[in-house]
A protein has these predicted regions:
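Crotonase-fold acyl-CoA enzyme core
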Residues: 1-88
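C-terminal alpha-helix plus adjacent terminal tail
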Residues: 49-51, 71, 78, 82-151
């Protein structure tokens, strides 16, 4: 997971990795970022969500107009860079340790094991690490955007 996420208003977020026939390491992060039910919906459907929905879910900190994205991001980065370095490091480490205490590291290890199993399965079936039709499915989904129209 990222420390701070700033998105433009026109950004869309999706995770169509299931179309590849395997899981990715991102599987472990979604429940932490957006909750279990939304994580399952995003992974099972591959449907995109808007930047505002991502913000409402806690996946994004700020949503700004595309024309303001660089300026907003640089202002925030400059503000953070002016903070006492040791205090920033301690704050980040504290939050990261809290996540570790809640099981994020264990989740990552489990996701990696499942990812290896998925790739091995696809190699046995298709002699490739991913579902052969997956790329086309993902391209089709990307063209559709955040319409939430299921086929």
């Amino acid at each position: 997971p990222f420390d701070i996420v700033i998105a433009s208003e026109d950004a869309r977020f999706s995770d169509p990795v299931v179309a590849f026939g395997v899981n990715g390491v991102e599987y472990f992060a979604h429940p932490w970022e957006v909750g279990v039910r939304k994580a399952k919906e995003m992974l099972f459907t591959g449907e995109a969500i808007t930047a505002q929905e991502a913000k409402n879910l806690g996946m994004v900190n700020h949503v700004v107009p595309l024309s303001d994205l660089t300026n907003f991001t640089m202002k925030m980065a400059t503000h953070i860079a002016k903070q006492p370095l040791l205090a920033l490091k301690l704050a980040k480490q504290s939050v990261n340790q809290m996540q570790d205490g809640q099981g994020i590291w264990t989740s990552l290890q489990a996701a990696m094991s499942l990812q290896h199993m998925g790739h091995a399965h696809e190699r046995l079936l298709h002699q490739t690490a991913v579902e052969p039709e997956g790329e086309e499915k993902i391209k089709k989904q990307a063209k559709k955007g955040a319409s939430n129209e299921f086929e």
